[in-house]
Each structure stands twice: as C-alpha cells, then as structure tokens.
Amino acid sequence: MASVYENSYMIVLIFLLLGILLPVVALTLGKMLRPNKPSAAKATTYESGIEPFHDANIRFHARYYIFALLFVIFDVETLFLYPWAVAYDKLGLFALIEMLIFVVMLLVGLAYAWKKKVLQWL
C-alpha cells in the first residue's frame, strides 16, 4: 500500500501526464480529421478584410527587446510578491525584510537602466 507521500507524487504525475497527453491527442486528432484544402487566399496575411499591400514580415528594433525584458522581470516580481502579500501576517518581520531587499534590488536595477538611458524611446 502506497503511503500518503507516494500518493501525492502519483497525483502530480497523473496530472502531468494528462497535461501533456490531452493537448497532444487533441492537436493530432484535429490535424487528422480536418480537411486539407490549401489555397492562395488561405496563405495570405489577414488584414481585417483588406487586401494586403505589402509583406507582413517586418523587423522590430532592438529597443523593443529591452522593454519586453523589463516587463518580464517586473511581472516575475509580481509573482513573488503576491504569495508573500497573501501570507504576510504568518511570515513575520524576517520575510518583510527579505521582500524589501528583493524590491530594493529591482528598483536599483530600474534606476540603473534609467540612468543609462535604456528607457528612452528616441
């Protein structure tokens, strides 16, 4: 008989397998069952019903990369701050100091990026 510890891992393993298997099966069945009728109209770029007048493949400037990277960093910060805020009363002063250090480190990085004029658009 499996212990509670092993049973917990079994449940996680089942969810992991289902999470991988169900999308793969659904996509495979969709690919096998759909009609395959390629045409030039289906291959064109969709522009709200208007006939496309140039190629849709454009190059983005490298500045977009920096903004995307900063967004991801502060988005991950939110992911770390939310559980801390929910359990704040149970964590105590040490967790508050740890979170303040974490936020200050991110703010120092933001100030550095601002000082280096990384955030200026033009």
Swiss-Prot record:
Keyword vocabulary terms for this entry: Cell membrane, Membrane, NAD, Quinone, Translocase, Transmembrane, Transmembrane helix, Transport
Main location: membrane
Catalytic reactions on record: a quinone + NADH + 5 H(+)(in) = a quinol + NAD(+) + 4 H(+)(out)
Positions of transmembrane segments: 10-30, 66-86, 91-111
EC number(s) on file: 7.1.1.-
Source superkingdom: Bacteria
GO molecular function, one term: NADH:ubiquinone reductase (non-electrogenic) activity
Gene3D superfamilies associated with the record: NADH:ubiquinone/plastoquinone oxidoreductase, chain 3
Cellular localization per UniProt: Cell membrane
Membrane topology: Multi-pass membrane protein
A GO CC term assigned to this protein in UniProt: NADH dehydrogenase complex
Pfam families given in the database record: Oxidored_q4
PANTHER family, sorted: NADH-UBIQUINONE OXIDOREDUCTASE CHAIN 3 (PTHR11058:SF9)
Family according to the record: Belongs to the complex I subunit 3 family.
Functional summary from the UniProt entry: NDH-1 shuttles electrons from NADH, via FMN and iron-sulfur (Fe-S) centers, to quinones in the respiratory chain. The immediate electron acceptor for the enzyme in this species is believed to be a menaquinone. Couples the redox reaction to proton translocation (for every two electrons transferred, four hydrogen ions are translocated across the cytoplasmic membrane), and thus conserves the redox energy in a proton gradient.
Subunit description: NDH-1 is composed of 14 different subunits. Subunits NuoA, H, J, K, L, M, N constitute the membrane sector of the complex.
HAMAP family, A to Z: NDH1_NuoA
Protein name (Swiss-Prot/TrEMBL): NADH-quinone oxidoreductase subunit A
Organism: Bacillus mycoides (strain KBAB4)
Gene that specifies this protein: nuoA
